Amino acid sequence: MITERQSNILNLIVDLFTQTHEPVGSKALQSLIASSSATIRNDMAKLEKLGLLEKAHTSSGRMPSAAGFKYFVEHSLNLGSIDEQDLYQLVKAFDFEAFKLEDVLLRASQMLSDTTGYTAAILDVEPARQRLTGFDIVQLSSHDALAVLTLDESKPLTVQFAIPKNFMNRDLLVLKGIVADRLLGKDVMTVHYKLRTEIPQIVQKYFTVTDNVLDLFDYIFVGLFRETIFVSGKVAALDYAGLATYQFLDEEQRLALSIRQSLSEEEMATVQVADSSEPALANVTLLTYKFLIPYRGFGLLSLIGPVDMDYRRSVSLINVIGQLLAVKLRDYYRYLNSNHYEVH
């Protein structure tokens, strides 16, 4: 455990270093700490011995280590003030007409990346917590059709497919009937289970050749089990991390899993400093903020950046964007669930 003065010294070094990215010496702290330069140097040496500070190669000053940043986040981090220009730009960015949920999620991800200069990712409600509330098949021609799936009565998913060659005219209706009878209204995990257990038995009753029918079921429904994730600012990872992290950002399902694992069920926000079990994220900071998607559940907004980021500003920005996002989604879903009449 460190003393109050040592904690103040660490906090000041973190603040100064994240602003200048230059090592901090005892003289720079003397006017901010009511102690002699020798006492400050002593405390800095103790903090270094504890692994919270480290020496710079080109200076006698000290800079925070990954452990030092982590200690700061866990014990001293509080929200900083938002620059008025930043706030104006954020509010202005959310003043647009959204035609679908993805428009809002993508805008939030882009704004977080643009204002921080780092990588941002945003996730919809976890697939396992969604329900299949609608299903239809629209035949486009004699050879292809479009499956329209609806999740949580508001999120559509379309899948175009070639009609199997051995299908008769009634077979699409039979397939639609099976879905309506066995899968509609069920949560996605139950749908997944039934596709593996119950549906193959049902299909045998209605189809002579079942292999291509089961393949078609898999093809139509596979999208239900994928995370909806938008990532902005991927190229920035080359500046603060490296090629491995940059390449990992393209593996969106793995990234989504890492983000979900960073936050427990009870937490509304977390800051993970060089502490991810995923090797590609092991040396970066991951900030995650949980936001409400009305009538459906919670989404996650994440910021991925360097360990030496400006935490006060970054945490404040993700909080403000999260709040603006919640307001925008509330208005969007209120409109979807209202009676809409155009009066001329």
Curated annotation (Swiss-Prot):
GO MF terms, alphabetically ordered: DNA binding
Superkingdom of the source species: Bacteria
Keywords: Repressor, Stress response, Transcription, Transcription regulation
Gene3D superfamilies named among the record's database cross-references: 3.30.450.40, Heat-inducible transcription repressor hrca homolog, domain 3, Winged helix-like DNA-binding domain superfamily/Winged helix DNA-binding domain
SUPFAM superfamilies the UniProt entry points to: GAF domain-like, Winged helix' DNA-binding domain
Classification via Pfam families: HrcA, HrcA_DNA-bdg
Gene Ontology biological-process annotations: negative regulation of DNA-templated transcription
Protein role: Negative regulator of class I heat shock genes (grpE-dnaK-dnaJ and groELS operons). Prevents heat-shock induction of these operons.
Family: Belongs to the HrcA family.
HAMAP family: HrcA (MF_00081)
Name used for this protein in its record: Heat-inducible transcription repressor HrcA
Naturally occurring in which organism (per UniProt): Streptococcus equi subsp. zooepidemicus (strain H70)
